[in-house]
């Protein structure tokens, strides 16, 4: 999924 939207994978 979007890694930019989440600080952690």
UniProtKB/Swiss-Prot annotation:
GO biological process, any: neuropeptide signaling pathway
Domain of life: Eukaryota
Keywords from the named record: Amidation, Neuropeptide, Secreted
Protein localization: Secreted
Modified residues (Phenylalanine amide): 9
Tissues showing expression: Limited to neuronal cell bodies, neuronal processes and sinus gland.
GO annotations of cellular component type: extracellular region
Function: May act as a neurotransmitter, neuromodulator or neurohormone.
Family according to the record: Belongs to the NPY family.
Name of the protein this chain belongs to: Peptide tyrosine phenylalanine 4
Naturally occurring in which organism (per UniProt): Penaeus monodon (Giant tiger prawn)
């Amino acid at each position: 999924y979007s890694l930019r939207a989440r600080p952690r994978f």
